[in-house]
Amino acid sequence: MVSYRDRLSQLPDDFLLQILSWLPTKDVLVTSLLSKRWRFLWTLVPRLNYDLRLHDNTCPRFSQFVDRSLLLHKAPTLESLNIKIGSICFTAEKDVGVWVRIGVDRFVRELSVSYCSGEEPIRLPKCLFTCSTLAVLKLENITLEDASCYVCFQSLKTLHLLDVKYLDDQSLPRIISSCSSLEDLVVQRCPGDNVKVVTVTAPSLKTLSLHKSSQAFEGDDDGFLIDTPKLKRVDIEDYWGGFCYIENMPEVVEANVDVIYKNTEKLLGSITSVKRLALCLITSDAAYPAGTIFSQLVHLELCTCAPRWWDLLTRLIEDSPKLRVLKLRQKHIRRAPSPRASWKQPALPKCLLFHLETFKWELYEGSQKQKEVATFILKHAIRLKTAIISPKPTSTLLEKHEMLKDLSSSPRGSSTCELLFD
């Protein structure tokens, strides 16, 4: 009988190397004990994954392991080098730059460095910023002071910068503009990043995510400027105010906008080409310019946490004639509306008469205002196929029964609509 280990050893080296590539490098090295054939096979693995947590968060042992394995590694090119340091590690702070330099010398294509902030910032070598083979670069909790030097990422297509600190306000635009082939960009800002306005000018960019969630940002002068003519998907989350100006974004088909800006007219007025839109605003008064039509919008998700959110819903269903899917959900803690706030039902929108097929409401509470909105949609959505109502988990059995009774007895415009109470 042939043992399992023998059957595995009969596989070709290329196939085995692909399997080993997806394991932590610490586990890959253990395979060298299997047999003579396996003794040096690990040295040709094209993907190296180092994680401090797998070494019991012991810094010296981790640094020694990475040093030794990189020195013994013999693959002429590296598909990826992934370094994750989840706790403060003073020895690694000094060594990461050396490890990255080795990766650059091995023509690395994907580089990821994630670090838990320590007393000393991790500094990356200058050779990284002119690496011609790099296609994916992901950095977290890194200081990019050396980016003030010459920067040229001619092959870079994916760039993720999470909680990164820069030399000055011009460092980030300099990095972005150096990526002539960039298609995917993620920027998550952090306090003390030395940036006031994030400027994104990228002719080839297709997906963009911008996040600012820390309360350390204050004032209206922190924000984003976007000029991305080829962009298809955009995700903007800003919970601490500021602004976002879009100069050129005519081809966006999918957008997530979750912000607390007082005025979003310029932002939403620039993405009228969207087909899918997820929206959470603090106000509906200046959401988008009057007369705007979302002529391509077929899928809308609207957050119900803002006061008078129903007014924004009214505008959107009136201005989205092709809407097929409507989803309502409270994503954040709701700001209580004025006791006198009332909902003015709209004239019958085209989307309800001709297109809406799916209506879903998550975390439904059954308040008077919510019942008004839900019954209006059920009554007038003539082509509605499915309505799914999901109560809040904290709702009592009696409350759920009342919600079900109210909605089940309400008139329905579609004789084929299936009402599901999840």
Swiss-Prot record:
Residues 342-391 form the FBD domain. Pfam families: F-box, FBD, LRR_At5g56370. LRR repeats lie at residues 59-85, 136-163, 164-189, 193-212, 214-238, 279-304, 305-330. Keywords: Leucine-rich repeat, Repeat. Residues 5-54 form the F-box domain. This is F-box/FBD/LRR-repeat protein At5g56420.
